[in-house]
C-alpha cells in the first residue's frame, strides 16, 4: 500500500489541516490487527502567534517532536486521561502540527468498539481522545514517522467531494478567536459543530 511521503506534510499548517480531510489514517498494531479511519476533523497549531500551541514559548522536552521532520506524530497525554495525536507540519525546526480531532471508522470496527466499550459506530472516533483509545495510539507512537509500516496515511485520491467548514478550535482558553478548526460539513463523525463557523 502506497503511503504519503514527507513532501506532502512539508506544507503550511493551515493548508495541511484542510488537505488531511478525507485522507485515510492507518495503524498496524503488529499482531495482525489493522485500524483505518477517514479523517473528517482537524485543528491547526503554530508556534508563532498562537498561544494555544505547545511550542508558543519555545522548545521543551515535551514538545520537541513538533520541531522535527514533517510527517511524524506528536502524541501527548492530556489531563491525565487522554492521548492526543498530532501530525507535525512545516519544515524541520519550525514548530507546527495538526491535531486529528475526528475520523470516520473504516476498518477494525469490532476492536474499536471493544477498546471504547461502545457499540455505536458514530461515537467511536468523534473526538481526539476517543480516536486514540479506539485505535490504540499511545505515547509509544510519539515521534513515529508516517513513512513507516506501523502508522501512515494512505496515498489515494478522495473521490467523494466534501464541503469544508472552518470554526474556532474546541477546548482551548488562549488564542480562541482563530478559525483554525477544519471539518467536513456533512460528516456524522465530527466531534461537534461550533459557533463562528465559515463554510
Curated annotation (Swiss-Prot):
| Pfam families recorded | Pur_DNA_glyco
| GO terms of molecular function | alkylbase DNA N-glycosylase activity; DNA binding
User: Which EC number(s) does the record attach to this protein?
Assistant: 3.2.2.-
Keywords attached to this Swiss-Prot or TrEMBL record, sorted alphabetically, are: DNA damage, DNA repair, Hydrolase
Q: Which CDD domains match?
A: AAG
Q: What start and end residues bound the annotated signal peptide?
A: none
A single GO BP term for this record reads:
base-excision repair
Q: Name the protein family.
A: Belongs to the DNA glycosylase MPG family.
Its name, as the record gives it, is Putative 3-methyladenine DNA glycosylase
**Annotated organism of origin:** Chlorobium phaeobacteroides (strain BS1)
